[in-house]
UniProtKB/Swiss-Prot annotation:
Pathway(s) the chain acts in: One-carbon metabolism; tetrahydrofolate interconversion; Amino-acid biosynthesis; glycine biosynthesis; glycine from L-serine: step 1/1
UniProt keyword annotation of Transferase present: yes
Organism of provenance: Legionella pneumophila (strain Lens)
Top-level taxonomy: Bacteria, Pseudomonadati, Pseudomonadota, Gammaproteobacteria, Legionellales
PROSITE patterns the record matches: SHMT
Protein name: Serine hydroxymethyltransferase
A Pfam family per the record: SHMT
NCBIfam families: PRK00011.1
Amino acid sequence: MFDESYTIKNFDDVLFKAISDEKRRQEEHIELIASENYVSPRVLEAQGSVLTNKYAEGYPGKRYYGGCEFVDVAEELAISRAKLLFGAHYVNVQPHSGSQANAAVMMALLSPGDTFMGMALPHGGHLTHGSKVNFSGKLYHSVEYGVDNNTGLIDYDALEKLALQHKPKLIIAGFSAYSRILDWARFREIADKVGAYLMADIAHVAGLVAVGLYPSPVPYADVVTTTTHKTLRGPRGGLILCKENEEIEKKLNSAVFPGMQGGPLMHVIAAKAVAFAEALLPEFKTYQQQVLANARTMCSVLQSRGYDIVSGGTDNHLLLVDLINKGITGKEADAALGRANITVNKNSVPNDPRSPFVTSGLRLGTPAATTRGFKEREITLLSNWVADVLDNVHDETNISRVKTQVLLLCREFPVYA
């Protein structure tokens, strides 16, 4: 039997130190990676619960194991709350990740070798949207669309021409580094012209969609996928949604289980249920409004400091900084900001001349900093510090000065008080 003395601290000091160090890093560094956020203690509690012990292959009421009556409650709560949150008829909360959700949709709607279209990774897409190094580009024939070289915006006319030329069976509308609003109706129109399914990947903007601050694709897309972290501020996991379509719903259920996965992670599903309940609260919309305000503020400050933003601005939680004209690489910028305790990620920009391991850009996002309590005042300070570091990535005295300021601000706004 187990008792309270069975702690990591008393058993594995190396691992305990790593966890403690990571907790300190999160408290002492400002997180600007657009895909990261901080979950509430309630989400942590659910994910660390005894539900981790339970195998539950199948779906609520139709399990292949006994003893699932209580984990069924958790999954049904997650499903019903997600339906309410997104206005969806069908929800599957079992995918372990956004990539698993995307893979399940492709398994449900495509056969190996079928043609589909997705946004090119260097233009802001995701690995699972057709990258040749990913399953999506290996199992299926992917055709990539991108952004206009001059505007940095999706070229819908060029996308339509590609669709008419290649006749894809599926079109993916979604991104990992695109700062503008997608025209779901235009995507639907293009998909209908070639008889394609339309899948919307809202992994980055799900929280904004949930509160009505970013247009919902649910009325337009055949299937919608998302992660449950990022702007949704839940545990790491995936989610599949769709409007009413019995045939597609059956295919999706079969693709997730038994097609892609065996037993679902019931402790994570419980944590999803908690996060969805939090997202249904009025304060979650207030939070998302601040995420947008902070992103606009950051964009404005960096532009005033002479930094180019791809597409010229942002309509969501992220912005892509183009460093080509500054003569520094994304890798150099990432490392320099890291030394100042500001965490970012290097990112390719459209038509980037450098490799994905080096890049010419930075992707910045405001969800985590906003969760911390930052508003326009703090974001203005922070954005100027970012520019101060980027102005001379080799000035260690200046980087040290910024780090000192960052630490003071972090103490003023702890993550877990």
